[in-house]
UniProtKB/Swiss-Prot annotation:
Biological role stated in the UniProt entry: Ligand for cxcr3.2. Chemotactic for macrophages.
One of the record's GO cellular component terms: extracellular space
Subcellular location: Secreted
Transmembrane segments: none
Signal peptide region: 1-20
Database matches in InterPro entries: Chemokine_b/g/d, Chemokine_CXC, Chemokine_CXC_CS, Chemokine_IL8-like_dom, CXC_Chemokine_domain, Interleukin_8-like_sf
Protein name: C-X-C motif chemokine 11-6
Organism: Danio rerio (Zebrafish)
Family statement drawn from the similarity comment of this UniProt entry: Belongs to the intercrine alpha (chemokine CxC) family.
GO terms classed as biological process: defense response; immune response
GO molecular function, one term: chemokine activity
Chief location category: secreted
């Protein structure tokens, strides 16, 4: 009987430790505030777009600056940020279709169904 009780107790302890996500990692966003409204374009090295995810419910846009100046968050609602994202998407589309002679418009959409970050250089 003691063996059965010990087995049940051990099973409950193991089952209690198995979880899908650590509670301490919830709501961990890279950007702690709303971010900058603009940065100098000549200082931009890379633009990363992070859609909302289980670990962060905000849409984040992080830019890496040249010359080791680090990373900064951009305000996703600012006009400057939307223009930077449009240029980055347009540049990426041109790189993926180098022999295309057609032109089109790119519409800004800050919603995404995937949770993987998108990076543009």
């Amino acid at each position: 009987m003691k063996t059965l009780a010990a087995f049940l107790l051990l099973s409950c302890l193991i089952a209690g430790e198995v979880n899908g996500q650590d509670r301490s990692s919830r709501a961990r966003c890279f950007c702690v505030d709303k971010g900058l409204n603009m940065v100098l374009l000549k200082n931009l090295d890379k633009v990363e777009i992070f859609p909302p995810s289980p670990s962060c419910n905000k849409h984040e846009i992080v830019v890496t600056l040249k010359n080791g100046a680090g990373q900064k968050c951009l305000n996703p609602d600012s006009k400057f940020t939307k223009n930077v994202v449009l240029k980055a998407i347009g540049k990426r589309m041109q790189q993926s279709v180098p022999h295309s002679t057609t032109t089109g418009t790119v519409k800004s959409s800050m919603t995404s169904s995937t949770s993987a970050p998108t990076a543009f250089k």
